[in-house]
């Protein structure tokens, strides 16, 4: 029934869909593949729908909608950052938040920025590139730059968050597993009202 309903909605049935329906049936899940397929997070700048593809992604999106703080844990490439960014952009467009802040630790795997060539921006840009790529795909470079110039969307290394007051903001901390205990403590001291 699930696969037929998907087919009738114009979706191509893939091997992944079949495997997924079998897994849902085995789990006796109350959520169907059709329910997951109906969930819409937003659209890319090209008009392509952004939606969860798995039950785990649907639960993640639901948690972001319902909770103030959500931790997304999973292997690389499973859509954690992309879906969170799509949710942030939707919340921003619908005036649910006044600002989007995307941050990640700039120093990963013991690297030291001081030894890299160039100014500070050229040193941190490679660490922030995945965030920019997703932003450009979801909202377009022009819209991002316009909102960035107004201070409504910020992409910055985690170290720049020290001493901030972040009111009415959707904050995404990417690659949180690479934070130090001191950085996590600093995050707990950021004022959010």
Predicted feature residues:
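Conserved P-loop
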Residues: 82-150
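Conserved small/polar residues in nucleotide/adenosyl-binding loops
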Residues: 190-192
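Interdomain "pre-motor" coupling segment immediately N-terminal to P-loop NTPase/helicase cores
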Residues: 1-37
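Conserved glycine(s) of the Walker
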Residues: 79
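Walker B catalytic acidic pair
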Residues: 175
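Hydrophobic anchor at the beta1->P-loop junction of P-loop NTPases
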Residues: 72
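Pre-Walker A adenine-sensing motif
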Residues: 51, 55-65
């Amino acid at each position: 029934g699930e696969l037929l309903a998907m087919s009738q909605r114009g979706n191509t049935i893939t091997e992944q869909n079949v495997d997924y329906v079998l897994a849902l049936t085995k789990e006796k899940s109350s959520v169907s593949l059709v329910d997951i397929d109906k969930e819409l997070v937003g659209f890319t700048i090209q008009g392509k729908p952004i939606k969860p593809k798995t039950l785990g992604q649907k639960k993640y999106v639901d948690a972001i909608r319902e909770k103030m703080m959500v931790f997304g844990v999973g292997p690389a490439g499973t859509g954690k950052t992309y879906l969170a960014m799509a949710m942030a952009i939707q919340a921003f467009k619908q005036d649910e938040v006044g600002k989007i802040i995307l941050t990640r630790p700039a120093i990963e795997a013991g690297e030291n920025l001081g030894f890299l060539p160039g100014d500070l921006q050229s040193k941190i840009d490679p660490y922030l590139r995945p965030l920019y790529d997703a932003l450009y795909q979801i909202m377009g470079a022009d819209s991002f730059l316009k909102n960035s110039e107004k201070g409504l969307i910020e992409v910055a290394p985690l170290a720049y968050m020290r001493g901030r007051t972040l009111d009415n903001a959707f904050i995404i901390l990417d690659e949180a597993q690479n934070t130090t205990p001191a950085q996590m403590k600093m995050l707990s001291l950021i004022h959010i009202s």
